[in-house]
């Protein structure tokens, strides 16, 4: 098992490239939160920001100033290692792209990353895998979409059981399954 965050790991004929940062959200824990781009508007927050440390928590007195000093999602994505062959690349990007129905929060509100959308359009990988907005497939009815030639998957999480996507990269066929949990 390897930590894929910010790395490129070959697996047979494929290259997996990981990205674990997400566009800022209104919740307190900010370990992996970033502004999407320079134009990003910070959402109304539920309490002050905190970072988790080995020995406890660190309060962030001014989250907006702190966040503006960090690289944006757009900048961090641009710094990822490039694949040898985009047609054999699988990006595992925690936050979903905007505009594909893979980013729909409770109440039907889209919260995806425009920077991720632009990155996928530019990088043109074979496949992207996403998470973060667990309820999205249940809210939007969409768990798989396309952005140009790229297949984008967000399996989500179902109250009915464990949600998995089984796929064949050679054939580019995928099946979403909800497995009952006893």
PLM features per residue range, with description:
Residues 106-115:
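Charged helix-capping and loop-helix junction motifs
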Residues 9-10, 22-25, 135:
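A short acidic, glycine/proline-enriched capping/turn motif at secondary-structure boundaries
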Residues 1-12, 16:
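Metallo-beta-lactamase
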Residues 1, 27-28, 102-104, 137-147:
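Metal-dependent catalytic neighborhoods of phosphoester/phosphodiester hydrolases
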Residues 17-106:
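Active-site-proximal loop/helix segment associated with metal-binding centers of metalloenzymes
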Residues 2-6, 90-94, 120-136, 153-157:
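Active-site neighborhood of phospho(di)ester-bond hydrolases with catalytic His/Asp-centered motifs
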Residues 12-13, 85-87, 124:
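Short glycine/proline-enriched coil/turn segments at helix->beta-strand junctions
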Residues 10-12, 114-122, 136-182:
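Binuclear metal-dependent phosphoesterase catalytic core
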């Amino acid at each position: 098992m390897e930590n894929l965050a910010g790395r490129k790991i070959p697996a047979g004929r494929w290259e997996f490239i990981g990205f674990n940062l997400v566009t800022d959200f209104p919740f307190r824990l900010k370990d992996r939160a970033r502004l999407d781009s320079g134009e990003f508007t910070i959402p109304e927050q539920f309490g002050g920001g905190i970072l988790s440390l080995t020995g406890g928590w660190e309060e962030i007195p001014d989250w907006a100033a702190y966040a503006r000093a960090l690289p944006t999602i757009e900048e961090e994505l641009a710094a990822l290692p490039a694949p040898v062959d985009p047609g054999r690349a699988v990006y595992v990007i925690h936050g979903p792209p905007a505009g594909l129905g893979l980013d729909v929060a409770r109440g039907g509100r889209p919260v995806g990353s425009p920077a991720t959308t632009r990155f996928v359009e530019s990088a043109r990988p074979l496949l992207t895998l996403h998470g973060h907005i667990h309820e999205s497939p249940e809210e939007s009815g969409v768990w798989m979409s396309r952005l140009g030639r790229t297949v984008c998957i967000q399996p989500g999480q179902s109250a009915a059981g464990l949600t998995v996507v089984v796929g064949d990269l050679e054939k580019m066929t995928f099946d979403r399954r909800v497995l009952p949990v006893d």
